[in-house]
Amino acid sequence: GLVGSEMCIRDRLTLLRRRDIGFIFQSFNLLPMFTAEQNILMPLTLAGAKPDRQWLRLLVETLGLKERLNHRPNELSGGQQQRVAIARALITKPKLVFADEPTGNLDSVSSAEVLSFLKRSVNELGQTIIMVTHDAVAASYADRALVFADGQIVADVNKPTADQMSELLMKEREAATMN
């Protein structure tokens, strides 16, 4: 009946999200009882899939987590926890990644490494990343940037530069304070 088909649709949506969509949140949502490696592999564990060890190694090395895999979240800095969350979002090689301020808790060097890695995953893996950020430098890594104000798109920039984005964001802040 209807209930059975609703559950079937819900199950299929869950599988789609688990397999084809990655999420990078501002709050890391790491499981405290698991190690960094177990947290990274969680989407694969839930799916009953075997990890691609080469991909895991690339993620871990790029994100600077090699020496931290056996640490639990409370033994990691905020930046390290965010990098674990990013690796977890990318471990399934999702087609689409939603990133909410993915570098918000990282220092400038770690931010640049993470943004470069996200850019590489777009160029080399064909992933699509939708990133929300208030950081002009982070936005400059995008192929396209949309600037929103009051729920409306006020600018659409292809291949944005940090200077362009900084200027646009400043204009929007000034406009918001005048209203």
Across the structure, where does each feature detected by a protein language model lie?
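ABC family nucleotide-binding domain
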Residues: 5-6, 10-142, 147-148
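Conserved beta-strand-loop-alpha-helix hinge in the C-terminal portion
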Residues: 152-177
